[in-house]
From Swiss-Prot:
Gene3D superfamilies: 3.30.420.40. One of its GO terms (biological process) is peptidoglycan turnover. It comes from Shewanella frigidimarina (strain NCIMB 400). This is Anhydro-N-acetylmuramic acid kinase. The gene is anmK. Keywords: ATP-binding, Carbohydrate metabolism, Kinase, Nucleotide-binding, Transferase.
Length: 370
């Protein structure tokens, strides 16, 4: 039996609903998930991060402090993950840390993306090398720096003769199109995933998320509001494209709802869920009228979302990635362990057709524990 090749993946997405940590063995043909853990983000830290995502005063001081605090939190996630296993820090080759995105603006004249969660702090607190800063090389090459998971999806989920779409629904939703033939793999952000439905229920019912989409399902979608939301210019942009909280956030939502204050809250929630489903389905149906659709990320656990989406893509067989042997909740975490493994072996990890970069590249940088 070959010696295990352990890497840890760390991911906290735009929904900021916790830090996902996974321990993965890459010694076999397919990655094997050994253990997983979600570290809650403390309320004070969450508040600070949400505030930092919007332009304000005194940003640099707050950024510096939060960078260290998020690094400590990510390290804690690793230590709690390993405590669940018999694997020691010395046996782990490296940690792949995505960090926490606080600004993603790739389309400016001098485009940039910024993730915080100091990798030096993670390395020192865990005694494991950290590979981080995966997105900025792609941006330096003229790309969007996102999405990065399609290269991983291609390696793990592509099957000749099968036209597949892998849909990741975090705060933002992104799709990877695996045509099953020699055609190019495509991938891009479709728009809002869970971020608006989470924000609206947090604001009105003080619940972290709409479990199973039950609140949305108790309402009725308002067609005029849905049409207005879908008229956002992002949805008509050609790919490669990526987005984040900079476009789809509470401030934008409040602006959109200004003329609809008379609606019942559950009707607004239903409309927001349909915004997610319609924007995803419109892009999937454009890529191919039929095929297989496998969903991962937090949205895969939302029953109402899955049901509504399935009705909008009638030509697709819909399931979660768990049906392909990769637990839907942990796909992104595993992808960042995979990105660390690619860096360690000097292998490129971006797909220029997806991000718009001028070439493939080895992504990230290594921060040593010693």
């Amino acid at each position: 039996m070959s010696k295990p090749e352990y890497f840890i993946g760390l991911m906290s997405g735009t929904s900021m609903d916790g830090v996902d940590a996974v321990l993965v063995d890459f010694s076999a043909e397919h990655p094997v998930l050994i253990a997983s853990h979600t570290e809650a983000i403390p309320a004070h830290l969450l508040k600070g991060l949400q505030r930092l995502c919007q332009p304000e005063t005194d940003e640099i001081n707050r950024l510096g402090r939060l960078d260290r605090s998020v690094g400590k939190l990510f390290a804690q996630a690793v230590n709690h993950l390993l405590a669940k296993t018999t694997v020691t820090a010395a046996e782990v080759i490296a940690i792949g840390s995505h960090g926490q995105t606080v600004r993603h603006m790739p389309n400016l004249e001098m485009g940039f993306t910024l993730q915080i969660g100091d990798p030096n702090t993670i390395a020192i607190e865990t005694n494991i090398d950290v590979i981080a800063d995966f997105r900025r090389k792609d941006i330096a090459l003229g790309g969007q720096g996102a999405p990065l998971v399609p290269a991983f999806h291609q390696q793990v989920f592509a099957q000749p003769g099968h036209s597949r779409v892998i849909l990741n629904i975090g705060g933002i939703a992104n799709i990877t199109y695996l045509p099953g033939n020699s055609e190019q793999v495509l991938g891009f952000d479709t728009g809002p995933g869970n971020n608006l439905i989470d924000a609206f229920i947090q604001q009105n019912l003080n619940q972290p998320f709409d479990e199973d989409g039950a609140w949305a399902d108790s309402g009725t979608t308002h067609p005029d509001l849905l049409k207005q939301l879908l008229s956002h210019s992002y949805f008509s942009l050609a790919y490669p494209k990526s987005t984040g909280r900079e476009l789809f956030n509470r401030a934008w939502l409040e602006q959109q709802l200004a003329d609809y204050s008379h609606l019942d809250q559950q009707d607004i929630q239903s409309t927001l869920l349909d915004l997610t489903c319609h924007s995803i389905a419109n892009d999937i149906n454009k890529l191919s009228p039929n095929g297989e659709l496998f969903v991962c990320g937090g949205g895969a656990l939302n029953k109402a979302l899955m049901q509504r989406l399935a009705t909008l893509v009638p030509g697709y067989k819909v399931d979660t990635t768990s049906a392909l042997g990769v637990d839907a909740k942990w796909v992104e975490g595993i992808a960042f362990a995979w990105l660390a493994m690619r860096y360690h072996h000097d292998l490129p990890a971006n797909l220029p057709a997806v991000t718009g970069a001028s070439r493939t590249a080895i992504l990230g940088g290594r921060f040593k524990a010693r």
